[in-house]
Regions:
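Acidic, surface-exposed loops and disordered segments
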Residues: 1-158
Length: 158
């Protein structure tokens, strides 16, 4: 497969088979992703690969916290609500998604279930958690570098 085919064919996956992913394949994908450029070759990323019982516990905890109304914690700021063309894109893709899933606008339970699926990593058999050393947190470059390696990871997995 050519690189332009990867980029053109990429799409967001929101449902996975439960088949285990071979460790050799995970190592290969991570090895490719780590070829990603970084500011001054800092390579600030760390990968934690979780699956099985550990991932099940993470999913259960995420679901419990969400249902209990515990506020989400984030390492990166989200900022204000989207507006203009960005909001239009956000709403447009949500309409397409919910339509494809057969979830009506008034279906609060269906929408909540969708949110919970996200907190369960859409039931993927493997989750890669990308972190960075906090000594680099003051540099905006770190966020860009982690974004670059995340993009490379997604494309390598494709």
């Amino acid at each position: 497969m050519q690189f332009d085919d990867v980029l053109r064919g990429r799409r967001s996956i929101r449902g996975y088979k439960s088949d285990p992913v071979p460790k050799a394949l995970i190592k290969e994908v991570l090895g490719l992703a780590m070829r990603s450029p970084s500011s001054m070759n800092t390579q600030p990323w760390n990968f934690t690969v979780v699956s099985g019982d550990v991932l099940d516990r993470i999913r259960a905890g995420n679901t419990e916290r969400n249902l209990a109304g515990v506020p989400h914690s984030r390492e990166f700021r989200i900022g204000e609500a989207f507006a203009g063309q960005h909001r239009d894109r956000q709403v447009g893709v949500a309409k397409q998604l919910f339509s494809a899933m057969g979830i009506e606008r008034e279906d609060k339970a269906g929408r909540q279930d969708w949110v919970l699926r996200g907190f369960r990593q859409f039931d993927a058999p493997v989750c890669v958690i990308i972190t960075y050393d906090r000594v680099l947190a003051s540099s905006d470059d770190t966020a860009f570098d982690c974004g670059a390696v995340t993009t490379a990871l997604v494309n390598a997995a494709w």
